[in-house]
A protein has these predicted regions:
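NAD-dependent ADP-ribosyltransferases
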Residues: 1-342
Length: 342
């Protein structure tokens, strides 16, 4: 990308806008929360050099997280739009501000976003609405494993769990809801100064050097391969269709389950390290999670899944070539199964 007079004008526009918000702060001592998000973007308009394609994918990723299926089978906004770290409110605001300098959010993106949700109604009532009929909108303090009835039955009766190498999820054949490079995470460093100077490569403040793309230096952080088991932290009614599931196991005591799982793995790998808990979702354009390992960090496009995972780190010689099962014993004392009629 080459710097231009048009980009100069945009940079001036953002500086002037930031100055107006700053003047309001000086006069009143505060701003409404949404204006703080706007002020934040005016100070650092990190999407200013991004391509329309980059912005479009970012828009669809946030849209995918800001809608849900209700127990009645209706599409509704997520109630946790402003999550505990305030990710999606600012993200949405910054996108609409940048699109505002480009003529507004393209209508095709609105249409594509609607299509993503309409797929749940392709066969009539969404599978998750039928599967969780009679359940409340949400269930707190549980983890939920989605899958085929025969596998969920084995998990309930025998505690049969399938452990998967992280490399498995890179397969192109997997659905978008499942496919991810689990041992890699990207961070996008704005490169305004380098682009304005006419450079096509630049270094980050941490010393990483790379090509400039979409106005960013895109750095990939990697970790060694590992094995994992995943579940969700709610009875989200989108999940059954996303994972082609006709059944689910609702585990009411995640800590007890994790303890049994760890004991089972220790029999296989006595000295193996294990990490258990909820996934932290991150924005590649933010560096809040820059120093965290990829194993419990995922791109915000997956945040609606509210994933809980158990990761274990066998040595290279112990690393399995493919997924395998272990049995933990019956889980009927800490879990219940729901399934579509057979």
């Amino acid at each position: 990308m080459l710097w231009s007079d048009a980009l100069d004008q945009k940079a001036v526009y953002w500086r002037h806008s930031a100055a107006r918000y700053k003047a309001t702060i000086d006069q009143t001592g505060s701003l409404p929360r949404s204006d703080w998000w706007r002020y934040e973007y005016c100070q650092t308009p990190y999407l200013m050099l991004a391509s329309d394609g980059y912005l479009g994918q970012r828009w669809l990723d946030q849209y995918n997280n800001n809608v849900r299926l209700t127990a009645a089978g209706q599409i509704a906004p997520r109630e946790d739009f402003g999550d505990e770290r305030g990710m999606f409110g600012p993200l949405f605001t910054h996108l609409t501000m940048e699109f505002g300098t480009r003529g507004g959010v393209p209508t095709n993106l609105i249409s594509d976003g609607n299509k993503m949700m309409n797929k749940y109604f392709a066969k009539g009532e969404p599978t998750g609405v039928h599967l969780f009929q009679g359940y409340p909108e949400t269930l707190d303090g549980v983890i939920v494993k989605f899958g085929q009835r025969e596998h969920i039955e084995k998990m309930l009766k025998n505690g049969e769990v399938r452990i998967t190498p992280s490399t498995f999820y890179a397969q192109p054949s997997l659905s978008k809801a499942m496919r991810d490079l689990e041992s890699e995470r990207e961070f996008h460093h704005p490169a305004f100064d380098a682009v304005s100077a006419g450079r096509t490569r630049a270094k980050t403040t941490s010393g990483f050097e790379g090509a400039i793309e979409d106005g960013f230096i895109k750095e990939t952080v990697r970790c060694p391969d590992y094995v994992l088991w995943c579940a969700c932290r709610d009875i989200d009614r989108r999940m059954p269709d996303d994972f082609s599931a006709d059944a689910a196991l609702i585990i009411s005591k995640p800590a007890v389950f994790a303890s049994r799982f760890e004991s089972g793995l220790k029999k296989l790998w006595p000295r193996v390290k294990i990490k258990v808990g909820p996934v932290q979702y991150y924005d590649p354009c933010s560096f809040v999670h820059r120093n965290e390992r990829p194993v419990h960090l995922k791109h915000f496009q997956f945040a609606y899944q509210r994933e809980w995972r158990l990761c274990t780190f066998p040595t290279a010689s112990q690393m399995p070539a493919s997924a395998f099962n272990i049995e933990l014993g019956t889980l009927s004392d800490i879990a219940e199964m729901v399934a579509l009629p057979s």
